[in-house]
């Protein structure tokens, strides 16, 4: 009877740990919400016809370990807004309604970048790699996803008449 009780306790503890560590942070669950004061710190490009520019990025890195014929790869993915390269022309957002509309448009770029980060992680992390092809395929998968989302960012500007 004691073993059954111990097994139940162990099972509940294990389940609680799994649930606790399976939750992701808010940052992982949704794109970051931008605002003018925090995310647009660079000096505006006065030659640009645009009122604002949101610069985003995504990076991946990995460490690989080969042991015999076994390949183990640990990936890390990061991305988001680059405030020191993003800018807004403050005189162009003096009107509150225009400011909200423009910030909403720029948020769209952040949302697309978030999709890139999530899709990039899926496309790069969950592939079948071999010792002989992993470096080439990781790079090729990342380049393919980056190109797709770069084109999506451009289409977004065209479609929203930015």
Set out the residue ranges of the language-model regions.
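Mid-length scaffold segments of soluble, non-membrane domains
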Residues: 80, 84-121
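Sec/Tat-exported extracytoplasmic proteins
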Residues: 106-107, 111, 120, 124, ...
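Bacterial Sec-dependent N-terminal signal peptides
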Residues: 1-29
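Metalloprotease/metallohydrolase-associated module, dominated by Zn2+-dependent proteases
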Residues: 27-77, 81-90, 130-162
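Residues in flexible loops and secondary-structure boundaries
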Residues: 9-12, 87-89, 110, 132
């Amino acid at each position: 009877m004691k073993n059954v009780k111990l097994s139940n306790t162990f099972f509940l503890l294990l389940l609680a740990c799994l649930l606790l560590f399976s939750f992701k942070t808010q940052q992982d669950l949704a794109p970051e919400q931008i605002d003018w004061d925090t995310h647009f710190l660079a000096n505006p490009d006065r030659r640009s016809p645009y009122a604002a520019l949101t610069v985003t990025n995504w990076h991946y890195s990995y460490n690989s370990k080969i042991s015999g014929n076994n390949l183990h790869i640990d990936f890390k993915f990061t991305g988001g807004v680059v405030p020191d390269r993003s800018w807004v022309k403050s005189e162009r957002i003096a009107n509150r309604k225009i400011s909200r509309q423009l910030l909403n448009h720029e948020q769209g770029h952040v949302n697309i970048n978030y999709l890139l980060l999530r899709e990039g992680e899926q496309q790069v992390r969950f592939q079948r790699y071999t010792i002989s092809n992993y470096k080439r395929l990781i790079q090729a998968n990342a380049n393919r996803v980056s190109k797709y989302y770069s084109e999506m960012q451009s289409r977004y500007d065209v479609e929203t008449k930015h």
